Amino acid sequence: MIKQRTLKRIVQATGVGLHTGKKVTLTLRPAPANTGVIYRRTDLNPPVDFPADAKSVRDTMLCTCLVNEHDVRISTVEHLNAALAGLGIDNIVIEVDAPEIPIMDGSAAPFVYLLLDAGIEELNSAKKFVRIKETVRVEDGDKWAEFRPYNGFTLDFTIDFNHPAIDSSTQRYAMNFSADAFMRQISRARTFGFMRDIEYLQSRGLCLGGSFDCAIVVDDYRVLNEDGLRFEDEFVRHKMLDAIGDLFMCGHNIIGAFTAYKSGHALNNKLLQAVLAKQEAWEYVTFQDDAELPLAFKAPSTVLA
């Protein structure tokens, strides 16, 4: 059978919190089968757990956070969640000694590196996928996102930013998902923001960790980072990274075709909730062997080495 995945060993890293600008220690721990993805704040006494769940997601101006029934939150989970989706990690406990996951370089690549460093282990339980059975679409003005049935996982994302630094030819990106494709084409794409927004937020004591080290920063005319872009179309690739993380908030890789126009965290989450709320639109599936498994989810040699 196709088995659930966790980590082989505990790994730790430090980074800076986007909101506070303070040092954050991140610890990734293996977890038994059927645990799911658990985010944990150890700065609270007793520690508070936040299971990844589409209904717990709140989108703020700066990030995605998970909120529990007592209105306690853990922030900036989206890029780590994308790395978990990319490598198909089903069970993990993610601990931080702060209210937020460190921003690292603004992409998912440092988290991918950390997960690969921990090593990935298969557990003796069947991996559950969410398979899309009916088309589901959500809209917000001219923005929209939809899932259609498809035996694999494809993503097709279009942005519409009217900015001199973002060429019109680089506003759409489509890919057949796989762990290899995610690592090579998506994981290194960084988040982006306007210099004026960062300066305004910092003047109000917010976004204190925001810098050229953790984002693509633009003014009204150009990219301000000395090293420029990692990809010509890094902006839309990062929006796809965000979507991969947002859609993994159900704790399972999804089998279906995702298409979006000008979508963001809130609309991605609205789509995921709309799918899960419509019983006939999806089902859980497991696979007995590699031959049945959609190509998108075959483990690359780098993951299960």
Curated annotation (Swiss-Prot):
Please tell me whether the keyword GTP-binding is annotated for this protein.
no
Q: Which cofactor does it need?
A: Zn(2+)
Q: Pathway listed for it?
A: Glycolipid biosynthesis; lipid IV(A) biosynthesis; lipid IV(A) from (3R)-3-hydroxytetradecanoyl-[acyl-carrier-protein] and UDP-N-acetyl-alpha-D-glucosamine: step 2/6
GO MF annotation: an example: metal ion binding
Provide the catalytic activity annotation: a UDP-3-O-[(3R)-3-hydroxyacyl]-N-acetyl-alpha-D-glucosamine + H2O = a UDP-3-O-[(3R)-3-hydroxyacyl]-alpha-D-glucosamine + acetate
Annotated keywords: Hydrolase, Lipid A biosynthesis, Lipid biosynthesis, Lipid metabolism, Metal-binding, Zinc
One example of a Gene Ontology biological process annotation: lipid A biosynthetic process
Q: Name one GO cellular component term.
A: membrane
Chain positions recorded as Zn(2+) binding sites = 79, 238, 242
Q: What is its EC number?
A: 3.5.1.108
**Which protein is depicted?**
UDP-3-O-acyl-N-acetylglucosamine deacetylase
Q: Which family does it belong to?
A: Belongs to the LpxC family.
Residues that span the membrane, as ranges: none
Active-site residues? 265
- Cited function: Catalyzes the hydrolysis of UDP-3-O-myristoyl-N-acetylglucosamine to form UDP-3-O-myristoylglucosamine and acetate, the committed step in lipid A biosynthesis.
Q: Which InterPro entries match?
A: Ribosomal_Su5_D2-typ_SF, UDP-acyl_GlcNac_deAcase, UDP-acyl_GlcNac_deAcase_C, UDP-acyl_N-AcGlcN_deAcase_N
According to its UniProt record, this protein's enzyme class is hydrolase
